Amino acid sequence: MAENRESRGTVEAELDPVEYTLRKRLPHRLPRRPNDIYVNMKTDFKAQLARCQKLLDGGARGQNACSEIYIHGLGLAINRAINIALQLQAGSFGSLQVAANTSTVELVDELEPETDSREPLTRIRNNSAIHIRVFRVTPK
């Protein structure tokens, strides 16, 4: 373990912020389904909550209601995704249940050199993710 830390520290020491510009690529997403919600920290919480509620209720006319939705959160947005799922469950009077899965997602960063004398680099890092299934329960 100590060997990994030392070698990683030397790589970090070579990456001077004056010499390289960090460009974070977008995370890889699976093909989007109509009932997938990707939560982020830029969009208003109430708007994201309303969008989830609208999918579950089927809009203003009650058409095309989804029996389940999947809420995805990455990194800092994990807490917001959990909060949205719990708010939906609390407002449903017991008709909705949640099931959560966690995972680790590999993210790729590009390091673009400021000068032509250096080559561009890529760096892979890991980030936590959560995938919450919110579904209707059939009354017994």
From Swiss-Prot:
Keyword vocabulary terms for this entry: Cytoplasm, Nucleus, rRNA processing, tRNA processing
GO CC annotations on file: cytoplasm; multimeric ribonuclease P complex; nucleolar ribonuclease P complex; nucleolus; nucleus; ribonuclease MRP complex
Protein name: Ribonuclease P protein subunit p20
Cell compartments where the protein resides: Nucleus, Nucleolus; Cytoplasm; Cytoplasmic granule
Encoding gene per record: POP7
Function noted in UniProt: Component of ribonuclease P, a ribonucleoprotein complex that generates mature tRNA molecules by cleaving their 5'-ends. Also a component of the MRP ribonuclease complex, which cleaves pre-rRNA sequences.
GO MF assignments: ribonuclease P activity; ribonuclease P RNA binding
Keyword Thylakoid: no
Main localization (coarse): nucleus
Similarity field: Belongs to the histone-like Alba family.
Lineage of the organism: Eukaryota, Metazoa, Chordata, Craniata, Vertebrata
The keyword ATP-binding belongs to this UniProt entry's keyword annotation: no
Complexes and interactors: Component of nuclear RNase P and RNase MRP complexes. RNase P consists of a catalytic RNA moiety and 10 different protein chains; POP1, POP4, POP5, POP7, RPP14, RPP21, RPP25, RPP30, RPP38 and RPP40. Within the RNase P complex, POP1, POP7 and RPP25 form the 'finger' subcomplex, POP5, RPP14, RPP40 and homodimeric RPP30 form the 'palm' subcomplex, and RPP21, POP4 and RPP38 form the 'wrist' subcomplex. All subunits of the RNase P complex interact with the catalytic RNA. Several subunits of RNase P are also part of the RNase MRP complex.
Native source species: Bos taurus
A single BP term in Gene Ontology: tRNA 5'-leader removal
